[in-house]
């Protein structure tokens, strides 16, 4: 008999064995998982919501989990984001993944979510098709040497740096033109001090029109994500340029970002980016 319940930190002991099997999660830890503390680390931080953590328990052991959260949209509605779904390799194809997914959808439906998004590697694509998710677009990974990014000197738009936030700012829990979840995930890494970075807000006549996060990925590269409101669409070039250029303080050589491929039109007028289509697949379902 399998029971679906809210996750607890003590479950991480069992989840270590799950994580050491086949992990279908695009943010998988480099080098894998060898300690319970590493698993606990995945269940902390600014982007983690305790209400959005369910586990599947069978005969006193946790054999799977699903982690999810919600984001606001410009229309005032909400989308749901499945951050990960993992089932012990010995329990796959036993409907546990389906039960976890359905339970998560039920909670998100109660929270007025209208659409759910997950990011899946090709190996797990068939599972999402079976639970009535469908592929929607693709993800483009962009790279550009900082020296090739033109300076945007507009004085109309004011950039505000958020100093030492201790939680995810409301302005960053938002999806419009950025890939859903990407802004909040990178912002959380900065808030949690897992990466060195900056959280930025952009204003036009005291009205918030955009947000950006930039973080030092390694000695040569910084990663950034930007999003804009409906009123900020016409100023997206300034938001992109100012956010990416902030990385010059760390003396990195290039910047990278991942965006929905259909938003390339926002980036291509700025510079000639190196572009590569991600193997990860965005899938979605209307609730």
What do the PLM-derived regions correspond to, one by one?
Residues 101, 108-121, 249-259:
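Conserved GNAT acetyl-CoA-binding A-motif
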Residues 126, 131-153, 253-287:
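Active-site/acyl-donor-binding loops of N-acyltransferases
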Residues 92, 104-105, 113-134:
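Hydrophobic, ordered structural segments
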Residues 53-55, 61-70, 81, 86, ...:
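Conserved beta-strand in the GNAT
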Residues 87, 93-106, 130, 232-247:
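Conserved acetyl-CoA-binding loop-helix of GNAT-fold acetyltransferases
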Residues 76-89, 219-232:
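Conserved acetyl-CoA binding element of GNAT-fold acetyltransferases
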Residues 15, 27-43, 47, 57, ...:
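Amide-forming acyltransferase catalytic core, primarily the GNAT-like/NAT-type
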Residues 16-23:
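Hydrophobic alpha-helical core bundles mediating ligand binding, dimerization, or RNAP-core interactions
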